[in-house]
């Protein structure tokens, strides 16, 4: 197909259209259409440049048998103009444009003539220039004709010469000059040139509006060329249209593909972003949910701990109340069983002949009478707790019953106190007696309490005031007065105990006082404060008791001992 087009274009003459090419070049320069693109589509300026270069090299194409170097030259010139196209692309583009031009001229596109193809005028001029061949210089006779201005409706039909130059030479030329008016030939509408609005059929002008051109003779070869051209045009019109439609379809498909891929990637990107946002939101919600669960678990654990502590506290209070109720019931039962007041110990005769017998009898009598005293004093003590509710078993103050028990035990041991020697074992024995009665007091505390109540007794006695029985200041005045009166009446000093009895008693007492050593060490700190506060509260007994309570750091507790028989006492004494 391209070979037929090249043969047709190479067989056409072309050397007389210089002025037309110059006008076309000027027109393209005035429009300002320049650099092309390197894509598949050929812009209009680039196509015009290709047609101009091809028309300039038309003579070279007709004279040369090798067309490839010529197309390389066209590609180079296109490169100089700024259009990067290969020789193959230039050749294909020119063939396609020429094919479509032929189809347009035949009127098979279904559109009005002159408006169907944008390069119609350029290709028509190129075809017109190619249809004339200059006459050889060696030919003496020239056939010329003076062409006059024809009406605007008339058109010039260029004759395409045969491809064989010898046929032209053999034809008989017209040897005379004459004026002719060329009428349009309708037998071959393919070669009808589009006429401008002027009356001149060609763009060739002279000074007198007449042009002398060579008129070739009409021969049979002309009809053959016309028929071959018609066949070429009909065979290539369909391929040109298909190529153009294919190019247009490719452009549309490429655009659709780009649009499709662009939309696809945009959609994928949006989906990815949405998924990431959902994952981030889910992650934050999970963290918040876990934090709330942790806080709720901590709150629940805290509530459980508080409930457990409250239950333990209530259980402890209940157990203590039950224990207190049991102790009160036991004490009341013992009080009912014991009956009256404990008997006072009998007075001992302090005779030298009865000293040893007195010691043993005194021990047995004291121990035998102590259980009853324990029951009575304990009952009185617990009754005082129930009535007043002011003194608890863990208080450090000396209740009245405890002080009375101290005075009673001290009175029972008055004979031993009058003896010469150290008084430490005596107070240890008093402390042991207090412990048997249920009062946990050390020997040192018992001694200090005894000295304090005696000091108050002396001060009250020196005031020479008559004390009533229910006096609140020094309520033990009458008991102490009876003790001192009895001491004054007896007058005789008791003899010291045998030496063999003292170590045994000291051994018994040392076992009982061993556990009280640490308590005495803690109580040394408040000893000095006891004396200072005790002196400032001389008038009122309540103040004196409060001062002693602040100084005393030890606690007392109720100890319910079972009744000991005299035999047990003797066994403990001599072990």
Swiss-Prot record:
Feature: compositional bias, Polar residues: 355-364, 561-575
Species of provenance: Arabidopsis thaliana (Mouse-ear cress)
Disulfide links within the chain: none
Residue ranges, annotated region (Disordered): 1-44, 157-181, 232-256, 339-364, 513-575
Function: Probable transcription factor that binds specific DNA sequence.
Protein name listed in UniProt: Trihelix transcription factor GT-2
Chief localization: nucleus
Domain of life: Eukaryota
A GO CC term assigned to this protein in UniProt: nucleus
Listed Acidic residues bias regions: 528-555
Compartments reported by the entry: Nucleus
């Amino acid at each position: 197909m391209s070979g037929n087009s090249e043969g047709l274009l190479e067989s056409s003459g072309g050397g007389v259209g210089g002025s037309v090419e110059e006008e076309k070049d000027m027109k393209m320069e005035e429009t300002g259409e320049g650099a092309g693109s390197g894509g598949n589509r050929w812009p209009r300026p680039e196509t015009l440049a290709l047609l101009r270069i091809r028309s300039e090299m038309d003579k070279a194409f007709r004279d040369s048998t090798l067309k490839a170097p010529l197309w390389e030259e066209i590609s180079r010139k296109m490169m100089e103009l700024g259009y990067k196209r290969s020789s193959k692309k230039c050749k294909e583009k020119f063939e396609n444009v020429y094919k479509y031009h032929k189809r347009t001229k035949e009127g098979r596109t279904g559109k009005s003539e002159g408006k169907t193809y944008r390069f119609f005028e350029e290709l028509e001029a190129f075809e017109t220039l190619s249809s004339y061949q200059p006459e050889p210089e060696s030919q003496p006779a020239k056939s010329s004709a003076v062409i006059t201005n024809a009406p605007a409706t008339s058109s010039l039909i260029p004759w395409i010469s045969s491809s064989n130059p010898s046929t032209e030479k053999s034809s008989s030329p017209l040897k005379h000059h004459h004026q002719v008016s060329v009428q349009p030939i309708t037998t071959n509408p393919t070669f009808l040139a589009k006429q401008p609005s002027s009356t001149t059929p060609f763009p060739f002008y002279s000074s007198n509006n007449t042009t002398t051109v060579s008129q070739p003779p009409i021969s049979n070869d002309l009809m053959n060329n016309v028929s071959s051209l018609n066949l070429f045009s009909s065979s290539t019109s369909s391929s040109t249209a298909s190529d153009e439609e294919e190019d247009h379809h490719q452009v549309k498909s490429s655009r659709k593909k780009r649009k499709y891929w662009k939309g696809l990637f945009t959609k994928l990107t949006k989906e990815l972003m949405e998924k990431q946002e959902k994952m981030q939101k889910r992650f934050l919600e999970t963290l918040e949910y876990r934090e709330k669960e942790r806080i709720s678990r901590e709150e629940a654990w805290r509530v459980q701990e508080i409930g457990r502590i409250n239950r333990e506290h209530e259980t402890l209070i209940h157990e203590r109340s039950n224990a207190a109720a049991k102790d009160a019931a036991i004490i009341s039962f013992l009080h009912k069983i014991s009956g009256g007041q404990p008997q006072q110990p009998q007075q001992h005769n302090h005779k030298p002949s009865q000293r040893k017998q007195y010691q043993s009898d005194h021990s047995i009598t004291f121990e035998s009478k102590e259980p009853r005293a324990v029951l009575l004093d304990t009952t009185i003590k617990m009754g005082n707790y129930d009535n007043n509710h002011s003194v608890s078993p863990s208080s450090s103050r000396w209740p009245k019953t405890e002080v009375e028990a101290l005075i009673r035990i001290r009175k029972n041991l008055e004979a031993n106190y009058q003896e010469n020697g150290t008084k430490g074992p005596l107070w240890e024995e008093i402390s042991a007696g207090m412990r048997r009665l249920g009062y946990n007091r050390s020997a040192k505390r018992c001694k200090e309490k005894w000295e304090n109540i005696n000091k108050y007794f002396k001060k009250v006695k020196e005031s020479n005031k008559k004390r009533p029985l229910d006096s609140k200041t020094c309520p033990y005045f009458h008991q102490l007065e009876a003790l001192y009166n009895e001491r004054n009446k007896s007058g005789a000093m008791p003899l010291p105990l045998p030496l063999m009895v003292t170590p045994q008693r000291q051994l018994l007492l040392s076992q009982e006082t061993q556990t009280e050593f640490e308590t005495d060490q803690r109580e040394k700190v408040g000893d000095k404060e006891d004396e200072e506060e005790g002196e400032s509260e001389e008038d009122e007994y309540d103040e004196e008791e409060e001062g002693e309570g602040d100084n005393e750091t030890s606690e007392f507790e109720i100890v319910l001992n079972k009744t000991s028989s005299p035999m047990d006492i003797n066994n403990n004494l001599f072990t």
